[in-house]
Amino acid sequence: MVSKSFKYPKKHKFEWINETNRVERVGSGLKRVILCPSMELIAILTCSNHLICCRSNSQRIWDVDFHDLEATELCWNHDGNLIVVGFKNGELKIIDSSTGHLVEQRPASRDLAVLMITWAMQETIVNEKRNDFLFDATAYMPLLGTLPSSAKEERIFSSKAIAQFFEPRKREGENNKKVELLSILDERGIRYINMFSSYKIGESDSLKSALNLGVPISHSITNDLAYHVLICKGGTNISLKTLYMPLLKNDLGSIVDIATMSTRMQHLVRYLEEVLNAMYEEFDNVFKSEASFIKTFDALVSKYSDTTFFSLQLELYQFIMNGIPSDLLKEWINERVGDRVLKNWERAMVNSYTSLIIFCQEFVIPACERLTVLLSSARGKSIWGHMKGNTLLDAKLVEDCLATLGYLQNNVFSFLNCLFEEKKYMKHFISWLNYAIVEFNTSEPSSIPPQEIIEHINETVIYIRHSLFRSKLTSYFMGTKPLQLRDPDYYSLKDFANQDDSNSVDDFVSFKTLKESLRDSFNVIFSYPSLTCQKQWLKTGDLVLFEGTDWNVSSLIPKSCNEKNQLFSLFFRKDTPNIFLIISQLMENTMLPVSGCHFGLDYAELLGSSLLDFQPATVLDMKLLNGSSILILGKLKEKCFLCEICLADVPLTFFEHQQKNSYLDAISHLPFIPLNSCLWLHEFEKDFLPSTLEYALSENSDYGVLISRESSRYRLFSF
């Protein structure tokens, strides 16, 4: 160990962000407060299970109530546009930070509370040489439309902020790629690791999984993404554990490629699901419009309970075929329908037909085209990879997914054909019915109908026989026929005019069946590479560092030390003066401690007073700042303070090459060193005594938040 000469405090650089000296209070109590890494936004989780998003001036943007779900953890993504929230029952919700709307909800894979969430972003170099497969045709397609909102369900793609999912990608061929890893941890260890938040590359699906490590209290990832370093509680001690995935190190480009395709296609499949759900809602409006129209006839029939009448459809058919209406039909047309009722029904039907046409032409078909392009690219990659001997995709599974997508497209075109015909025939029917109403109410009926009525009488008959109150469109939504791949009879467009009564819902594959089949086919495509990735995880290190499980940890792998892959870890017990700094380095696929220091804060020396005896300050909380300094929230008697310690001023003791189980003894024998130098120190007034702190290191500024859980108050500061 080499002793160092300490310096007195430098110029004070601590300042409150809120210049009005205002301390914010949350009445229901503070459970968790985190800062956005890219914008000056705060996410607050209250004890009453409310998630509040605020600006740095504490102005509320939105407030979400989770009701009976008990939230346990939350995390921002790097761009600050999404917040992921974990719950006690194991569920996850991803929230749009601009609106507070739900983006995605994921059920719990196991009934354990979410303890930790890390959403890491690394900019890595992917050595991709297959430039022929990097061309992205979807980048030159128009952006997809934003779905209308719904009262029945919360749609992801009703939010304009989520339109970024389908923005054209940057220029292809760039080697630098930003790779995101979303990790969810519970008391057994890592539940799963997703690349780009949705593509699963690791899951603890069995008790023998390498991801089952114990209760995690810290999780760090190396820059090449291949090593995950965790500090866990287990039994009666604290351990340093290393996970290694060779595939991430040796063939990162292939996984990033597949994960990127999977994520984009998953968004498109979800988009299609929401569009089809919207079409079901719109068709429900068609059904309700028809039901309300026919209800006027049924109400009239109920007055004549002693007389037998045909249905409205048959009454109209009999009238148009022989030109003589029954007394009941004449009474219904004269007294119950009228011009106003007919116009309202026509307007409702035309609006629904128009909405369904727009959904098909401007939403479903363009999304299917994009998905076809991506699936074709995936098929090419799988064939190329098979030739090279390192494929992670099965070409046959991709072809099956393309076939399912082809069925959906065929169904949509057939549905559009049917929809256009029914809309046209309905207008002819209404023209004929308007003519009949006029004829019934005139004193001198015309002997010959107008030429327009005569020319379209066949279409009117078809509409009454096959569509009125029993729309052929129903079969596309209520069909019960199972999907059979490579069915040659399915690829012929159904002719609306030639359909007869023998065609029933049993002869149609519904949109719902196709939607579920597409989702299943898509999941099968990427399940094989995902399973391959999950089996690659190896636990290469498990070292006991401390006895007891009441240690708090702050650790990180600084970006400035990426080449060395060093892990800086601070261990402390709350309300005690002891602080341990342990620096570990990756050696032979295992993170091993190489140096450490056991120190405490000499409060008297930190203040620059030589008159006071050594007075060790107790630690309330501390955070590492990118491998260069430490923020320490401390307390001495009634005084509470915050200071920044430079890591260069911390004297280190280097460990000799130890056996794996002897680090515990080496760390426990580190001598205690009083530290009497800091970069700055700030004492707090008695009206606000914080107990914990959070910080965010952004490109523009460094800022943090001090939290007093006892008084449910918080305040932002910069440094």
From Swiss-Prot:
Disulfide bonds: none annotated. Gene3D superfamilies: YVTN repeat-like/Quinoprotein amine dehydrogenase. One of its GO terms (biological process) is cell division. GO terms for cellular component: anaphase-promoting complex; cell division site; cytosol; mitotic spindle pole body; nuclear periphery; nucleus. It holds the Pfam family WD40_Apc4_C_fungal. Keywords: Cell cycle, Cell division, Mitosis, Ubl conjugation pathway, WD repeat. SUPFAM superfamilies: WD40 repeat-like. InterPro entries: APC4 (IPR024789), Apc4-like_WD40_dom (IPR024977), Apc4_C_schizosaccharomycetes (IPR056357), APC4_long_dom (IPR024790), WD40/YVTN_repeat-like_dom_sf (IPR015943), WD40_repeat_dom_sf (IPR036322). WD repeats lie at residues 57-96. The APC/C is composed of at least 13 subunits: apc1, apc2, nuc2, apc4, apc5, cut9, apc8, apc10, apc11, hcn1, apc13, apc14 and apc15. Interacts with apc1 and dim1. Component of the anaphase-promoting complex/cyclosome (APC/C), a cell cycle-regulated E3 ubiquitin-protein ligase complex that controls progression through mitosis and the G1 phase of the cell cycle. The APC/C is thought to confer substrate specificity and, in the presence of ubiquitin-conjugating E2 enzymes, it catalyzes the formation of protein-ubiquitin conjugates that are subsequently degraded by the 26S proteasome. Has a role in promoting metaphase to anaphase transition via the ubiquitination of specific mitotic substrates. This is Anaphase-promoting complex subunit 4. It comes from Schizosaccharomyces pombe (strain 972 / ATCC 24843) (Fission yeast).
